Amino acid sequence: MGNKINPNGFRLGVTKGWNSRWYAGKKQYASLLKEDEQIRQLINKKLAAAGIARIEIERAGQQVNVIISAAKPGVVIGKGGESIKELRGDIERLVSAGTVAVNVAEIPNPNISAPLVALRIAEQIERRFAFRRAMKQAAQRVMESGARGVKVILSGRLGGAEQARTEKVLEGRVPLHTLRADIDYGTALARTTYGILGIKVLVFNGEVIGGKTETFARPQRRDRDERRPEGGDRPARRRPTARRRTGGE
């Protein structure tokens, strides 16, 4: 089940939170859900160069709070705050009622953010990079940035082949069935001349214990000299003596 289900949905309420946090009745629920989807589409289209990793929407009464997690917050804010003011006006035209507040959060380490890694691979494939090279370089970059494991899945007409297939790159370990595992999940689409390729990235950052993500170092293997007891070399083994078997009368 861990290989099929969305890793974020599988861990909701355990180690992951909701991207939309509000409550509405039966009559308003559908319209507010549609507004959230329109807001996300607008932000992803308007701020594609900012490296958007996550968009959270909170509603309380007539107040709508949009939190944008981006690798380049300067692109979201713009010169003198012009871009964020324009974005706030566009969102207010989509929202049925209430005032809109837009906040920007910077991602401290974009190299271990799964959505950003997937977007980077998609950009390289669209610029005609070799897909295997792009996948391996992305996985190595994630591991060098301190992640415990990474899994990259690429599917579609790879290399312009007639038949679609799937290729995977795995570095470290990615425990999909462990609910306390802090796994970041992201997807992206690479639009090429021979079709659309789907990219999935899963990054394992450690295990969440007591509300904190803890990483455990792998035990290092000791050398042979360190494993020997103090006081000399290893005692020689006695070879078993061969017994001569004689037949009885």
Curated annotation (Swiss-Prot):
Keyword Plastid set for record: no
GO biological process assignments: translation
Record-annotated KH type-2 domain positions: 39-108
Keywords per UniProt: Ribonucleoprotein, Ribosomal protein, RNA-binding, rRNA-binding
Subunit structure: Part of the 30S ribosomal subunit. Forms a tight complex with proteins S10 and S14.
PANTHER family membership: 30S/40S RIBOSOMAL PROTEIN S3, SMALL RIBOSOMAL SUBUNIT PROTEIN US3C
Family: Belongs to the universal ribosomal protein uS3 family.
Protein name as annotated: Small ribosomal subunit protein uS3
Upper lineage: Bacteria, Thermotogati, Deinococcota, Deinococci, Deinococcales
